[in-house]
Amino acid sequence: MEFQSDLTREISPQRKLGRGKIEIKRIENTTNRQVTFCKRRNGLLKKAYELSVLCDAEVALIVFSSRGRLYEYANNSVKATIERYKKACSDSSNTGSIAEANAQYYQQEASKLRAQIGNLQNQNRNFLGESLAALNLRDLRNLEQKIEKGISKIRAKKNELLFAEIEYMQKREIDLHNNNQYLRAKIAETERSQQMNLMPGSSSYDLVPPQQSFDARNYLQVNGLQTNNHYPRQDQPPLQLV
């Protein structure tokens, strides 16, 4: 315990506060600057290597010292990585230019559409007899011709629909008339049947029309008004139905 307390007393106040932040600025001393460069360069190369291995990334590192000495690192090839970088920058610039061109094109098309919409709105107002102050005599004549042409087309279509409606109503009237006649005939037939059924002593023979009779021997109809000179006299009297 005494050794531990003595060790605690020997720790300086700076050690207790921990490592402070180092101010980032140019090192004026040449020797110190060179030493720092070597240390930081090695650390940077180590970090680049670790990044390429851990993350499977293509890394290229180029460093020039203050004296112009070159230091480089690449897990593949510095030249190949630089070419890939140039291509990526070119593609991104082309993509930006294409996007800009597309945006400009769509803006122009939108302007054209807005102009067309404005013209159509003005024409509609002119057809309604509004906003005529900006039209000259020629424009007014053209507008009048267009309106008259449109009115003639509207009238022709209206007459076509009216004629079709009249034709349909006429056919409908004929159908209704035929149905009415058929129903009247059915009603009259039903009334006659009911009257015949209500008559007393009615039988199947009552259905025979008047002024006609039946010859019981041969069931031939004989006119009651005709004489019997045309028929041979029968010796036997005719049968009578009871």
UniProtKB/Swiss-Prot annotation:
User: Which residues belong to any copy of the K-box domain?
Assistant: 103-193
Spell out the molecular function terms from Gene Ontology.
Answer: DNA-binding transcription factor activity; protein dimerization activity; RNA polymerase II transcription regulatory region sequence-specific DNA binding
Source species, domain of life = Eukaryota
A Pfam entry, by short name: K-box
Q: Which GO terms describe its cellular component?
A: nucleus
The segment(s) forming the MADS-box domain are 19-73
Q: Where in the cell is it found?
A: Nucleus
| InterPro entries linked | MADS-box/MEF2_TF, MEF2-like_N, TF_Kbox, TF_MADSbox, TF_MADSbox_sf
Q: Name one GO biological process term.
A: positive regulation of transcription by RNA polymerase II
Tissue pattern of expression reads: Expressed exclusively in stamens and carpels.
* Chief place where the protein resides: nucleus
**UniProt keyword annotations, A-Z:** Activator, DNA-binding, Nucleus, Transcription, Transcription regulation
What is this protein's function per UniProt? Probable transcription factor involved in regulating genes that determines stamen and carpel development in wild-type flowers.
PANTHER family documented for this protein:
SERUM RESPONSE FACTOR HOMOLOG
Q: What is this protein called?
A: Floral homeotic protein AGAMOUS
Species in which this protein is naturally found: Petunia hybrida
